[in-house]
Amino acid sequence: MAPVATTFLPTASNEATLRPSFVRDEDERPRVAYNQFSDAVPVISLQGIDEAARAEIRARVAGACEEWGIFQVVDHGVDAGLVADMARLARDFFALPPEDKLRFDMSGGKKGGFIVSSHLQGEAVKDWREIVTYFSYPVKSRDYSRWPDKPAGWRAVVEQYSERLMGLACKLLGVLSEAMGLDTNALADACVDMDQKVVVNFYPKCPQPDLTLGLKRHTDPGTITLLLQDLVGGLQATRDAGKTWITVQPIPGSFVVNLGDHAHYLSNGRFKNADHQAVVNSDCCRLSIATFQNPAPDAMVYPLAVRDGEEPILEEPITFAEMYRRKMARDLELAKLKKKAKEQRQLQQAALPPPPPTQVAAELAAQKPKSLDEILA
């Protein structure tokens, strides 16, 4: 474990400006405020999903996935008390002293635990967040030595929470399978032995939120993600490749549902993979808990339904592990290229000779305010 003194934690920072490692290029910075809410993302009640309302719910879910790849669900059946306990324990964990959190430091390739910014290696710019992550399904993947032992009750609550969200995810995948004209279990079966990873995000107050992101723009690689968020706001989505962004309106008692790349491919591109990011603010902290439902590493990725007039969007079947590897390699390569281009621009600017004094004087004279006589002339 790295010494506490050498590990920067945003939750422990009282610095008035951002460290350079968190400052993003201008084209990546937020353009919409964390609390400038939009109701464009559909909110769908799951009341009656196993009864007469199923056809209507199926149509609404399919429509949301075709338009956004993201929607919110209410009346989902997950106990409100359990959700409250999960959120409380998460907040209590991030309030622990740095040395307690860093006991579970996951840097250096450890699977599960605590880290700042991201568990991905090679990122050029850090995200303004702290996370704790654990693997909960298949059950054999649970490494309790990487699960926090503080606060008290963590293990029992997160096991129950994980189980309930696995059930909700499978129910939603069943609806999407039917919308594709397939058997109810088709999407779940395509995952083979479904993985589940939970990532608890804590976004502390940020001294310069206009210069950074809590979580950079991305799509999730897996099948479906269920996000619990508090009422602060900060989740943003785009459906036009980043030209415009909206901040998703937090709704008490809801889960945000994101479709990932895997579901996008299985639907042959019919359903969008949610393009999203998280912004931060200087007023208050924000908490979110993302539960990722992913296929097994050896599950084959290929469209399950190709409609008339369509061509498969994949040339050939590949494993999910290979799909994920290609995605990460591409993202890291793009980040490296962008970093290199930025460094080259900085070197070129530093190499430019300063303007001669006569040019500076002329520019200053041009900016000098006109006299009243000149204005009225």
Curated annotation (Swiss-Prot):
Source species of the chain: Oryza sativa subsp. japonica
Query: Any idea what this protein is called?
Result: Flavanone 3-dioxygenase 1
State where 2-oxoglutarate binds.
286
User: Could you say which enzyme class this protein belongs to?
Assistant: oxidoreductase
Question: Which pathway is this protein engaged in?
Answer: Secondary metabolite biosynthesis; flavonoid biosynthesis
Q: Which protein family is it in?
A: Belongs to the iron/ascorbate-dependent oxidoreductase family.
SUPFAM superfamilies in the cross-refs: Clavaminate synthase-like (SSF51197)
Work out whether the entry's keyword set contains Manganese: no
What gene does this protein come from? F3H-1
